[in-house]
Amino acid sequence: MTKKQSFLEIETLIKVAKVLDELKIPYYVSGGYAVSIYGRPRFTADLDMVIKMVPVQTDEFSGHMETLFPKGYVDREQINNAFKEIGEFNVIDPESGLKIDFFIAQKGDFEEECFKKAKRKDVGYKVKFTSPENLIISKLLWYKDSGSTRHLEDIESVLSNSNIDKKYLDSWIKKLGLEEGWDRVKALE
């Protein structure tokens, strides 16, 4: 990734965060971009954002995305279907090539905690990122589903570069049954 490409991706992140703030849609950044904030920088092909959007907001949101990325990929039908079927949709910025994966927040205690603990980090604009603890837990959930060791490497990176609330982390690992993945992470250290 070139410096210009990286700059364009950050610009895209900022534009999307500003729209979400303007529309008062709660959100946080997770995935590889969050790993780069709390751990070692790493390449990621997409931007993962969890949003608390309700179906009545889809038209306004879609309109803003179409204005922001007039030559990009914005599929209103996919956005509407995210509430009925798949729980996610994406938008592509043609200038940076960045694919933004939007995940509709699921109901549950852990998801509520993720929104409560999300922190604004200044990347040229104060964008909300998941907390390092919740990033680790999310990565353990993804590892449990996919088996990809990339998630374990990301966790190791976040652990080595962030101040972590171990009590909070241990509590949620137990509640969500993520001990097996957590044991694998500890074996990497």
Mark where each language-model region is.
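Compositionally biased terminal segments of proteins
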Residues: 1-189
